[in-house]
């Protein structure tokens, strides 16, 4: 589960390109919160602070307590606009979290892929899914899904039915899908072939 980030924002009543430019000259970033059947709320954030947090891993799945005029709102980042040259945050869309569960897209981390059994035997680790869509308890939103693939053999696929998800999370589809495969290169040995050759060498 990701830690809850505490951020402060100011409400804003002036809109449009001119108002946004004026905010940025003051070192602030325009943003908006919407969703959950609520009236959208226009806010501004401190530019250096939001850019710093954006550059940390998995910001887009970061649960945030946003304080606006002494009121707290539980939100999630939805979209981030960056400056094309400096990568400084220019605008952020947030969504209100009012439901008990939230549909989330989170990154997948394949732990041990460089030293996976199939890779050691000459195979190539092929990532099919870099992100997966989950339905998560809003109090248990993971920053990522980590999968240990160290023991994955050559010429095999990693399927969703074999994945243990973080507590309070499930895939949004019941249909099985492939996340990764280890593809055999020419001359690569499958586990069975390797064992057979080892046995023959021992005779």
UniProtKB/Swiss-Prot annotation:
Can you supply one Gene Ontology CC term for this chain's record?
cytosolic large ribosomal subunit
Q: Which UniProt keywords apply?
A: Ribonucleoprotein, Ribosomal protein, RNA-binding, rRNA-binding
Give the disulfide map. Answer: none
Q: Which SUPFAM superfamilies match?
A: Ribosomal protein L25-like
Q: Name one GO molecular function term.
A: structural constituent of ribosome
Pfam families (alphabetical): Ribosomal_L25p, Ribosomal_TL5_C
The record's Gene Ontology biological-process terms are: translation
Q: Which domain of life is it from?
A: Bacteria
Among InterPro entries, the record links this protein to: Rbsml_bL25/Gln-tRNA_synth_N (IPR020056), Ribosomal_bL25/Gln-tRNA_synth (IPR011035), Ribosomal_bL25_b-dom (IPR020057), Ribosomal_bL25_C (IPR037121), Ribosomal_bL25_long (IPR001021), Ribosomal_bL25_short (IPR020055), Ribosomal_L25_dom (IPR029751), Ribosomal_uL5_bac-type (IPR020930)
> Which purpose does this protein serve, as stated in its record?
This is one of the proteins that binds to the 5S RNA in the ribosome where it forms part of the central protuberance.
The record's family statement is: Belongs to the bacterial ribosomal protein bL25 family. CTC subfamily.
This protein's assembly is summarised as: Part of the 50S ribosomal subunit; part of the 5S rRNA/L5/L18/L25 subcomplex. Contacts the 5S rRNA. Binds to the 5S rRNA independently of L5 and L18.
**Protein name per UniProt:** Large ribosomal subunit protein bL25
Its organism's taxonomic lineage begins at:
Bacteria, Pseudomonadati, Pseudomonadota, Alphaproteobacteria, Rickettsiales
